[in-house]
Amino acid sequence: MAAEGASDPAGLSEGSGRDGAVDGCRTVYLFDRRGKDSELGDRALQVSEHADYAGFRASVCQTIGISSEEKFVITTTSRKEITCNNFDHTVKDGVTLYLLQSVDQSLLTATKERIDFLPHYDTLVKSGMYEYYASEGQNPLPFALAELIDNSLSATSRNNGVRRIQIKLLFDETQGKPAVAVVDNGRGMTSKQLNNWAVYRLSKFTRQGDFESDHSGYVRPLPVPRSLNSDISYFGVGGKQAVFFVGQSARMISKPIDSKDVHELVLSKEDFEKKEKNKEAIYSGYIRNRKPADSAHITNDDERFLHNLIEEEKEKDSFTAVVITGVQPEHIQYLKNYLHLWTRQLTHIYHYYIHGPKGNEISTAKAIGPFNNIDIEISLFEKGKTPKIINLREIQDDMQTLYINTASDSFEFKAHVEGDGVVEGVIRYHPFLYDRETFPDDPCFPSKLKDEDDDDDCFISEKAARGKRPIFECFWNGRLIPYTSVGDFDWCAPPKKRGLVPIECFNRISGALFTNDKFQVSTNKLTFMDLELKLKDKNTLFTRILNGQEQRMKIDREFALWLKDCHEKHDKQIKFTLFKGIITRPDLPTKKQGPWATFSAIEWDGKIYKAGQLVKTIKTLPLCYGSIVRFFLHGDHDGEVYATGGEVQIAMEPQALYDEIKTVPIAKLDRTVAEKTIRKYVEDEMARLPDRLSVTWPEGDELLPNEVRPAGTPIGALRIEILNKKGEAMQKLPGTSHGGSKKLLVELKVILHTSSGNKEIISHISQHGGKWPYWFKKMENIQKLGNYTLKLQVVLNESNADTYAGRSLPSKVIKFSVKEGKPEKFSFGLLDSPFRVGVPFNIPLELQDEFGHTTQLLSDIEPVLEASGLSLHYEGITKGPNCVIQGVVAKGPVNSCQGKNFNLKVILPGLKEDSQILKIRLLPGPPHQLKVKPDSEVLVIENGTAFPFQVEVVDESDNITAQPKLIVHCKFLGAPNLPVYTVDCSSSGTSILTGSPIQVQNIKKDQKTLTARIEIPSCKDVSPVEKTIKLLPSSHAACLQIFSVEEQKAIQIKHQDEVTWVAGDVIRNLIFQMYDEGEREINITPSLAEKIKVNWTPEVNKEHLVQGLLPDVQVPTSVKDVRYCHVSFQDDHVCLESAFTVRPLPDDPKHLKCELKGGKTVQMGQELQGEIVVIIADQYGNQISSFSPDSLSTLSITGDGLDSSNLKITLEANSQSVSVQGIRFTPGPPGPKDLCFTWREFSDFLRVQLVSGPPTKLLLMDWPELKESIPVINGRQLENPLIVQLCDQWDNPALVPNVKICLIKASSLRLLPSNQQHKTDDKGRANLGVFTVCAPRGEHTVQVKGVYNKSTIEGPTIKLTILPDPEKPIRLNVKYDQDASFIAGDIFTDFMVSVISESGSVIKNINPTRISMKMWKLSSGMSRPPANAETFSCNKIKGNDKEDGCFYFREKTIPNKVGAYCIQFDFMIDKTNILSSQQVIVDVLPNQPMKLVPDSQPATPAVSNVRSIASRTLVKDLRLSITDNYGNHTGMDLVGTVVATIKGFNEEDTDTPLFIGKVRTLEFPFVKGSAEITTLVLAENSPGRDSTEYFIIFEPRLSTVSGTLESYSLPFMFYNDVKKQQQMAALTKEKDELSKSITMYRSLFDANKQLVDEMKCQAEEAKLKETQLRNELKAYNIDIPATQQTTHIEALLEKKITEQNELKKRPRRLCTLPNYTKRSGDILGKIAHLAQIEDDRAAMVISWHLASDMDCVVTLTTDAARAIYDETQGRQQVLPLDSIYRKTLPDWKRPLPHFRNGKLHFKPFGNPVFARDLLTFPDNIEHCETVFGMLLGDTIILDNLDAANHYRKEVVKITHCPTLLTRDGDRIRSNGKFGGLQNKAPPMDKLRGMVFGAPVPKQCVVLGKQIDLIQQYRTALYRLSSVNEDLDNQLQYLHTPDMKKKKQELDEQEKSLKRIEQKLGMTPVRRCNESLCHSPKIEVTECPIPTKRMRRESTRQNRRPKGDVPN
């Protein structure tokens, strides 16, 4: 075969060959196939490079030898005609062309086409990426076949119908050697495409340029579910590799659609080897082009099967067949023997291509569609056997089918990876059902575990379900990649700690991942390259798919909740019944405490266990016998439920022995034990119980009751026995034979009774030792005084309980007392300190026994006192309770006033501890003597000096002593006015006694004798000391004199003299002299010169002072300044001074000076008020009289803008000054003005202030341009306050206060607050405030006017453009399908309602409960909905609802009755205002024709077969119409007939009456929806049985109706007797009347019953609502009394509202930055208004930190931001949210950086917290989190800078530290920089209101919730009262006499009807009213509440015509 494919077939190329292109020419090969006699071979034609189509055609004609006039076409092998347009593009070197009569001509004989299939360079590039290999015990052969199926799937992807792929295993030896054929009905391949297929590694992406096929380049398919795009033939490798993996040779046969030719290519290993041997081109060959079903070239017997295969080509439009021969023997055996296995594997690989995106859901029938139209069929042909044919669609045990059909629920998700990478995923849950796992087993992964004896709960072993298999199988473009699986993701992996569900639930999930082609797979499609790595990348985004829509949510939380729901709903093992409630179990760990559902019974393994039932446990230590208390099941359950586990609470039995409750797993109940066995065990255990104690004292020291004992007396050892009632000793409680019983212990307690309570001082527990009894050792430690109790108590071993099962265990009590012993030691009591030398003191003693108890001294004892260095003696010692050593006196030296420490030893002979050391501090005694130094009696001093005396105060032991008020005085005698010296020796006892100098006046040369007396006035007992003083004259300075030396003559300047001198001159030659007390001149020494001071100069030349010279004096420049000159001398003895005054005189004229008398301001246009005074002054400004009247003419005045016309200049004679008046300026800018005054050579300048003139106009401050209209939203405030400024006529601000300002506006424009008069302030401004504007849409004007001095000042006109409010609803927009028809009883089309604002935009975020739909039947004059109009609520929003802010009314039932109905939609704006839509009028049309009915029910005829026509008349004037199921007339367009037939009650009865004319049927025409039955008469002497009921069946026969219409049946009575017929006719008439009356009665009673049921439902619902709200109020500690509820609620509500209003009125921090107008919903507002902060310090620092962003306006869209930008000319900052990169935004739940992996890395101080966590958002929380997350990032706030620095220093050790702020206002930037003004927040007042506001108090929010609840409760209470009142009224109405009478009448009429029917002989069938017969069945539950829709439909169907029921 291989040789044939490569050789020259049938001589087709005889005489031809390929020489290739020569010298730029192209070689073309031509086949002439115009007729049968054409040449078989091809012709080679050389085509010039520059040839055109005409020349080429001429060359063809010449080469073939045909006329150029002959008609023919030249085509490619793909039948593409060569024309002048495509010649250059198509005719290339080596191309094969056909000569045909027409393009679609059949190929009469086969041709060959030369091809090259040199492998693509990717062969080397990707050579290492491909090989088939076995994995995990799997044979790779199915995967090789899958490669061929991939190609077929791609080929059939464009099929509109069935995509058929056949794999034929041709193993019948009679037909040739084994072969495998893969055939599909795809689009086939052209010869060029077949050539491309042969090129190795030519993938679909590289088929460009030279490899370009007939089709365009690769186009990626559109996304489809599960990526089932059939785009899986990818790399140009798999098909060829698969072929040569299966066999040695491949034959490719293909026919493209719309092609006349079949293309065939053979590749074989043998042919390749032959070409290599012959040195031929290996990668070249021929494609055979032939007509379909032509197998003439198949001559090899080994390939006989090809004839049949080729024969099948006739029936195919397009196909491709891959025939593999030379199949490996091992492959043949595998394909034969393991057919089911590898077909199952193929089904697994292509599961979703075969069954569609949902997979093989066996329970769901599927129609052929785009996702399940693939048939893959496997055929096995063997010799002598019937062919086996398997369709993969029929295989039901592939793993995906098992996964899908054993799963109870699924969790769908989607992952987005690296842009376009999309992975769809599904997780399925396989529940545990009753006794086994339902997770399917995979033969490749056996996971069944051996049964193990589980000692725990009913949980199965952890890996029992899925085992070790990974969760996810992976599909690429919908096709399984078998060797790649993903174990799990972080969010679906079993948690390390127990979560919401048991851990085994994670092993009950399977899953599948479906990727698109953005993920790389190996070229053999066995493995993914990096799927798991990409999916587990941190940037991969997982979303959940709900209802086909992606939803962004936390995938881990959603999965955990889904898994919990699956576990609770689908896992079933134990049935829990008799639900009791939900509890928490505080005895368990916190995470497991609740919720727990409690039940009273379970059903398990066919048995029922109930509360109270006796049970026994197994596998517990010990075994438990007891009664069931209840069952626990973890979770929030309600009602009966199945679960896999649970616990049972058991009360141990007998309870007298085991007063204990145990909880064990349900699995540990013994299901085999009999109940009588448990009861016998309980009875046996009740016998043995302890009764009393036996106490003995084996070692003596017995304790007697009520004994009094000295402290320390021992209590002897105790021996105790526990005796039962039989007197038997026992050591333990009786226990079961199956477990350890509880030991008994004896507890001994000694209790001391004190005033503060009982105190347990001894507590011992003794246990029985087996060989020795209960024993307590001797007790010798009872030493405290008081009353005692010794108690012996039997207790339990573990719990130490003294009761068991409610009974006290035996005990024994002995009471006794303890008193003090004899004295053994002593201590000192509280001493009265201080201790002083020679002063007696007492020493109190406290005597104690050996245990420290206080006792008394009874015997005579002489104390001994000893102390080193002291002499001691005492008076005596007292006995009795208070022992004191009295009158102790100590004497001796103590060295200092602070005293000295001594150890005083006290000895009491005769005591056990007879001595104690008392540490005392002995202080000096009281003053006794005064010592004065110097010791000399006569002392000599100089006058004016002080004398110091050294004084000491000593006690009797010569110790210097001190005491309070110890003051020593020294008085001098012998002269007047002598000082007195005092010194305080209170602290030290010694000091220097001195004082003021002794100064005696007029002591010149003689000395003076004085006496000094020194004494202590406070101590009269201390003798005074006297000294004699001799006083000499002083040698210190006593006099200072000043002289002025002029011309060698010194003139004395006396003290306080005045000296006149020329202003500004200097006084020189001043000298001074000093004299002492003896009038002796003192020589000035440098030391004395240092002490001389002058006041007119700070620096004095010391050398001049030594010479007696004083500094020069500078005379003041102003004659008004008088200078005071002072000279002083001061030393330690004296202070001398001498002073004089210098008065200046004026100098010569020098300057001209001007002075303004009056105000400096000049009002524009007015003269200067006041005058200007001009004077002449000297150089220092002193005025000089120089002016004269003649000299005034030379005075000139100039200035900028000065108006000199009114100047007045006058001379003031008295002051010698010039007065200037009449200063005025020309109008100009206000400001300072300079005036220049000039006289002779002198000039001066004067500045005045030019101010604005009188007010004449008004201007607006800080207001936009008035040329443009200002936009403002209706009902909103203006952006800026209205501030008015008064101005003069030249537009200068006029500072005039109290000018009245008012606004002039149109009446249609309303300003709030209302128009009030305002007055200007001191600056001429008036702030009218910020107005709220309400006006119609459009432009309005407002004018400002003022009143000044009774004249009007016109102000500017403000133009306002009123914009609609985007948040104010004005109308409802209703959308629905207006072309829809409304059929009675059907479902309305969907209504989509949106609330439209004034601006025309849709208002979003509206509570759906505020939207309602009302419907009522339209009647004349009714425009408003009636009270009984039906009301509907809107439906929940679905996932695919695109429009936000829209409300949907879906599936609302159309009324049953036809007519015009009105639909109106209402929006509740608030409690009083409702906005209604335009009414929608709908015409309800009748439904489908269903039955034939009469217009009015005729009476039951009674006829006979007599001659009289009246007696034979059945019907007279009967009109029959077609109606639908609801009684609406329909079928007006129907045409046909109504056939009347008489039938008997028995179908077999043939003796039925006949119509007139002896016919059985009559036909009546049916037109325009009805048939008129004018007269229907029986035939005379008609057959029929007497007194028999017959029926006339009126059957409609209408040609245009599909289906059968219900016929109308009219009963009638037939009689043979005329008289009887007349009687029966009367009875029939009466029967009809009774039937009608009964029907109306029943309708009445049924309607009343339904009304009562509905009222009961409403009452119960109202009661439940009231109870629910009452409980919610209790949570807020609000109790509602049982009586006077309404009064209490109203008072409580008023109180809460008052409290809330008071809280809201409290002042709190506000942001005063003006917000931006929210003219649309896309504007959120300025950042400063979006958040609030409670803490003032945090608000200050965060506001400062964001200061540059606070006035930025945040918008949702860039368009809205751009609009604001344009409106404000770019002045306003804007921030659109749709431009924020959200991946870098912080996670608001992220912990602070000092937490690492959930652990505290270091302990911070300063209360760190993320700044963003301090923000609260009143609105738009999600958007605000985005904004502030971007602005603040991870900024942290702490208390102070120290805390912040410490925090940063620690954080940077582990991670990056964000910006830190402190509550003190400091900032540390993220780079660590802090300090400076730019990092320090200013005070709050400096932020100018640009600060975040404070939220309302939390209590205000709580009050708001309480008020809302109270209002709801008030409404619910009113509702409950109203409903109960209506129900009571209705029940009373049902028991009224009138209703009882009607009930009685109904009973009587039914009895009468029954009698009449019996008389008539009619079948007693109750024919109820038609509407009642078809009323829906309503399920009866515990609460008789039908569903809302059922009630509505039932109410409609039971409507009856108005009118009274006949009485």
Swiss-Prot record:
Question: What positions are modified (Phosphothreonine)?
Answer: T1500
- What is this protein's name? Structural maintenance of chromosomes flexible hinge domain-containing protein 1
Q: Which residues carry this modification: N6-succinyllysine?
A: K1803
Return the annotated region ranges for Disordered. Answer: 1984-2007
InterPro entries, A to Z: HATPase_C_sf, SMC_hinge, SMC_hinge_sf, SMCHD1, SMCHD1_S5
Catalyses which reaction(s): ATP + H2O = ADP + phosphate + H(+)
Where is coiled-coil annotated?
A: none
Phosphoserine-modified residues are S833, S1975
Q: Does the keyword Disulfide bond apply?
A: no
State the CDD domains in the record. Answer: HATPase_SMCHD1-like (cd16937)
As for family, the record states: Belongs to the SMC family. Highly divergent.
Please give the record's induction comment: Expression is repressed by CDX2.
Instruction: Give the N-acetylalanine positions (modified residues).
Output: A2
- Which residues are recorded as modified (N6-acetyllysine)? K1350
**PTM statement from Swiss-Prot or TrEMBL:** Sumoylated with SUMO1.
What are the boundaries of the region ATPase activity domain? 111-702
Q: Tissue specificity, please? A: During embryogenesis, specifically expressed in immature olfactory sensory neurons.
